[in-house]
Amino acid sequence: MSLFKRITNLFAPSQQSNLIECNGYFYHFYKGQWVCLFNDCELVIHKFENYKYQIQVTRIVDQEQENERRKQREAEGLEDEEEEENLVNYFEFPVTNGLELYNEIGPLGNFSLSWKGTNTRFLFEFDSNNNNNNNNNNNNESIETTGNQLKRILCQCIYESMYLTPYTNGSDNEIDNNCREFQTIVRAPLTTNVKTIQAEKVTLPQQSQQEVIEEDVKPSNLYLPKDLLKEEKKKVLNSSSGSTTVSSSSSSSSNSFIKKLAPITGEELFRCPVSLYLETNSQFNLKDPQVIVLLNKTKPLEYTFYITKEDNVPIFSQLIDSNMFPQFFNEQISFIWFNALDEQPCRWSIKFSIAEEYEEFRSKFTVLHYEVVNQAKFKGKKDDIEYMANILTEDHKDDEIVFDTDDGFNAHDLEDFDNLDINESNSVADLLSEHQNSDQELDQESDDDEEDEEDEEESGEEEEESGEEEEEESSEEEQVKQPVKKPIKQEPKEESEEEESEEEEEESEEEEEESEGEESEEEEEESEEEKDNGRKVFRVPLRKPTTESEESDEDEDEEESDEDEDEESDSEENLSEDKKQISKDFSKSKNSSLIVGYKDKSYVVRGSTIGVFNTDDDGIKFNTAITNIKQKDGKNFSPKKMMLQQQDQTLLMLNPEKKSNVYKMDLNRPDIVEEWDMNWRNQPTLTNSVVSQYKNDDETNNQLFVGYNGNNMFLVDPRESKNKVTVKFHGGSNPKSVTTCAATTGSGQIAFGTSKGEIKLFSKTQFDQNKRSVTSSDPLGAIARSRTTLPGIGDPIVGIDVTKDGKWIVATCKQYIMVIPASLKDGSSGFEDRLGARRPSPKRLILKPQDIKRMGGVVNFTPAKFNIVGDEQSETSILTSTGSFLITWNFRKIKQNILDVYQIKQFQDGVVAEQFKSNRDNSIVVTFPDNVILSKKK
């Protein structure tokens, strides 16, 4: 294709939906090299819908050469039908923000663009020979001009796909800023944050130049277009007359890098020569081409990672543990780790020259890492070592897993979470101030009530005296009056004088009746507020003094008044206790846990008080406080492991001091109405936590739930009169592996996480007595055998969650999060089938290096959770936090094996707990030690 024709197509494409067409070479990244897929191809930017674009790459075949090839194969009696079926001639890629567009120099030295695909990176290199102009400078300028135009069009397409608006609405700066991070000459393989390793260049001695050329040319030629092999080899050989360069570091830089450390100690377990790299400016630069990596046993179950020179002088040492954030990369046969011990945290890398040595190091390091974390000798099989090593390998490919091809990525996913509603009334200081003000108002009201009573008594005495002097007027005043409830904020009323007319007296009586009605309404509202606040305050009506006609009832009235005074004193005592407890919880305790209901209410625990917040679309607002959470003996406790039930009508909770009991709170009262003993065959059963029988059970009236402790699990039916525990299983006699967390699917399948990092999957029929034998005479219950057990790399599982359909699991460890597909490509499920050697390998979610550095190298994730969805919906996000950072991963991208797409937001205070609102993926309730907010997308 001529240059004129190609340039013409840029401005007047043959199809209206094609924005640009270019010719060149097409590569994909494989084992650290660009492997040529198409020697000649055409790249087209195709628009198929509004704001939706595709990159289409098509192989160009020379028909004459193809016919000759077929004739030759027919003459040889070979069939090429199978070869044609397996031959891929076409690729297409959706243009989205996740494309990660890079501007690179291709393998042939021409202008190139690379982008991220589903499983690896792809590169398009412009063809410099497909040009009628013999001037090389003009060729290069033409290629660069066309390449920049292609890049500009791609940037505009990315802008439109992000904001669903024409790119003309955005300025050049907005478009450039949006694509700036992708416009770099550094390329990176998929699923890693590692940039292409670029080293400093030094001149080698002339005597070794020819050897280096022969070593470098052969492997690199295997990945170049076949028709240019001879020409490329000539260019390289001709350049041997001058100076030849390889990736290395100068001797001066190597010497300056060496630090004086303590001598190497311990038993040597592994030794291998490697090259050492240091990450600077998102690139790994070669620091020393010839160092030795050592793995030594320095103490029992303590191992040290050394980097030394040939003379055994250590230049680097670090204890092996999870704080290294270890990562293996098979394609680059390299190992990367994080060092937070220095003043400036940084990442290092070692690259092996022999694949066998790399595999040996990978297996050895995996075992040592497991033993350090568990503080126990590894006793697993060789298959378990390979499985654990694959978890630490970022680019490991599992053939049993099928990732999504539908991008499912839209502008909504790109919106960052922002704190749109920080209601100042939700801060504990303000809530406590409000509480104290309300107490002062109550005290002031009681003082006003006493003054009202005294004024009423004086007015009554005046009425009696006036009645003796004038019998006619006193007879009217002797009418029996109904008792009046105490006013809220009412000034004392003066009685009418003797000289007032009957009309004035009637008007005053009407006013009194109206005031009584208003007071009763105000008291009803106040009683409702007090009920919501969880405080039992008895409002006793106060009666006015009686006249002589009521003397016969004085004794009864005195008795009633005595009872009223007793009840009022009791209510005042209750109020006083509530005041003290609230003040204690608010001043001495911090927010400790959060649970979000599906009816737009959230519950935050602070000491023995539960704060109730309304969480609607407008924001979050404090509603009331449930105080004085007590046991049967009246002792207060701080609830743990809460769980909502029966459409947010009841709240289950555990007491850390009585671990064999479960408490049920009626949120309509609100008060603890039942305390259940978890007894199994007349033996108390400890309960570390509870989980619903089915996912989203809080939206139904199902009362059954699952409890667990250690390696035991049991089904609880609160409707049973005596034995609440109906079925129980125990997991054997291994006390070193205990259950730490659990989650259920919509069909009742159960996933458990353990302290050894294992994940155990149980069928939905686990507690079905018709399908499973539970008649064991063992007082601990029958043996629980999981359908599938996934080994861990040693880090305890601190949280676990499962999608409603049971196809995906998210497990949280301290420094990383694992996402595990529970279903294989053949439809097998880890919950229902015994997968054995086919068990899927987890994918680790690790923060980017720059974010880890922001945190000072300290990462401590809270239990990650999927967003809560209803029927016929699928989860879209994973939510967690560490320190003061709130993090949300895009789950749709994770299902495509793209693991580094997440949003991170920093707050001033540390995050205690966080949870999505029900059926919302854009609103998050965030709890801090002294505040509660709603963070949502714009």
UniProtKB/Swiss-Prot annotation:
SUPFAM superfamilies, per the entry: WD40 repeat-like
Protein name, UniProt field: VID27-like protein
Lineage, highest ranks first: Eukaryota, Amoebozoa, Evosea, Eumycetozoa, Dictyostelia
Basic and acidic residues: bias regions: 66-76, 576-587
Pfam family, one: VID27_PH
Keyword Secreted: no
InterPro entries given in the database record: Vid27 (IPR040458), VID27_C (IPR013863), Vid27_PH (IPR040768), WD40/YVTN_repeat-like_dom_sf (IPR015943), WD40_repeat_dom_sf (IPR036322)
Keywords, ordered alphabetically: Coiled coil
Organism: Dictyostelium discoideum (Social amoeba)
GO cellular component assignments: cytoplasm; nucleus
Compositionally biased region (Acidic residues): 440-477, 494-531, 548-575
Gene3D superfamilies in alphabetical order: YVTN repeat-like/Quinoprotein amine dehydrogenase
Coiled-coil ranges from the UniProt annotation: 56-89, 461-582
